[in-house]
Amino acid sequence: MSRKKQAPVRNVLADPVFNSKLITKAINCTMLEGKKTTAQNILYSAFKLVEEKLQKDALEVFRQAVKNVTPLTEVRSRRIGGTNYQVPMEVRQKRQQTLALRWLILFARKRNEKTMIVKLANEIIDAYNKTGGAFKKKEDTHKMAEANRAFAHFKW
């Protein structure tokens, strides 16, 4: 166990446009090399694109997309008697949101569209429609947990 103190959880300020902490966290995940205004422009432009394509409120679409991508269970390695077992565990609330945002942005970056704005908008739409890379990642995570259910009694 680490002897150091755990870092205190810092309060995230709500973003200026939508007044949402979830959007601020998404901006921070999108940000590269400390360029926050660029990340904000990308996210807000992607939201405009989502509104144009779906004719629905972008914030509600984004919240539903994050909800669709949020994992409930995951597997974690545990060493018992010289063997590593993949033990399925429930994911804590904060980690659920973090993983969902991380996967959305990761799979948006992997897409083949021209700009990050279009990539992110299409990944949000796909997650909203329960398709796309981020949703597939969630499904794969749940399948792994289901496949290793026999080791659930090794929880700690």
UniProtKB/Swiss-Prot annotation:
It comes from the Bacteria. It holds the Pfam family Ribosomal_S7. GO terms for molecular function: rRNA binding; structural constituent of ribosome; tRNA binding. One of its GO terms (biological process) is translation. InterPro entries: Ribosomal_uS7, Ribosomal_uS7_bac/org-type, Ribosomal_uS7_CS, Ribosomal_uS7_dom, Ribosomal_uS7_dom_sf. Coiled coil: none annotated. This is Small ribosomal subunit protein uS7.
